[in-house]
Amino acid sequence: MAVKLDPIHQFELKPLVSFGHIGHQHIAFTQSALYMFAAVGIIALITLVATRQRALVPGRMQSLAEAFYEFIASTVHQSAGHGSERFVPLVFSLFMFVLVLNLFGMIPYAFTVTSHIIVTFMLALVVILTVVIYGFMAHGVHFLDLFVPPGVPGWLKPLIVAIEVVSFISRPISLSVRLFANMLAGHIALKIFAGFVPALLAAGIWGILSPLPLALSVAITALEMLVAVLQAYVFATLTSIYLSDALHPGH
């Protein structure tokens, strides 16, 4: 019983298929990988179903898909500015991937993939590497103007450059921790309050208080649904802002 009530137990990785060991490291296909494959499959299926007809007068599914895409396209354009259209597919894919994974975590007994820092960090690393690679491809060494804001006095440039470099390097950390921490904390709180209900029901007369944690669990669940959507949007928005540096370094 103690294991079931452990709020951290839900984040434990469980190997589904083992591929042996490399040194002391166990290599396995876990439920985390399964949920990520499922998310990609669901997104691909919905996209194919929604766009299979490509009618001039769109149906409900096509209208919904277009609304989602146009919403992200608008976000990218507002955050990254001119020339950002080429990054809309990337940001849209990241948004949908994070959104579906977050919503998976709201299903009872499902696994919350985005509660693992390694997953969110790799997603953030994709963003930063895209910024760096495209920045150098499009602007060459002038991409480094990103670290030298215009109008800075010469004597102050070494300090400003150092601060800008540290800030840039910390971006994947802050981007990944923001998503990871929000999903982790919310699911821990939900598990704790949900665990109070059977505990109070088994405590005799104290069972009359069980509706209180039940109501809190419902409220936290609703809040977590909102957080799941908002965190996907925040991830997409920050990605767009970071991509603007690749498009317009030094501005």
Swiss-Prot record:
Key component of the proton channel; it plays a direct role in the translocation of protons across the membrane. F-type ATPases have 2 components, CF(1) - the catalytic core - and CF(0) - the membrane proton channel. CF(1) has five subunits: alpha(3), beta(3), gamma(1), delta(1), epsilon(1). CF(0) has three main subunits: a(1), b(2) and c(9-12). The alpha and beta chains form an alternating ring which encloses part of the gamma chain. CF(1) is attached to CF(0) by a central stalk formed by the gamma and epsilon chains, while a peripheral stalk is formed by the delta and b chains. Gene3D superfamilies: ATP synthase, F0 complex, subunit A. Its main location: membrane. SUPFAM superfamilies: F1F0 ATP synthase subunit A. The chain crosses the membrane at residues 29-49, 56-73, 87-107, 117-137, 159-181, 192-212, 218-238. Keywords: ATP synthesis, Cell inner membrane, Cell membrane, CF(0), Hydrogen ion transport, Ion transport, Membrane, Transmembrane, Transmembrane helix, Transport. GO terms for cellular component: plasma membrane; proton-transporting ATP synthase complex. InterPro entries: ATP_synth_F0_asu, ATP_synth_F0_asu_AS, ATP_synth_F0_asu_bact/mt, F0_ATP_A_sf. One of its GO terms (molecular function) is proton-transporting ATP synthase activity, rotational mechanism. It holds the Pfam family ATP-synt_A. This is ATP synthase subunit a. Belongs to the ATPase A chain family. It is a multi-pass membrane protein. It is found in: Cell inner membrane. The keyword Lipoprotein does not apply. HAMAP family: ATP_synth_a_bact (MF_01393).
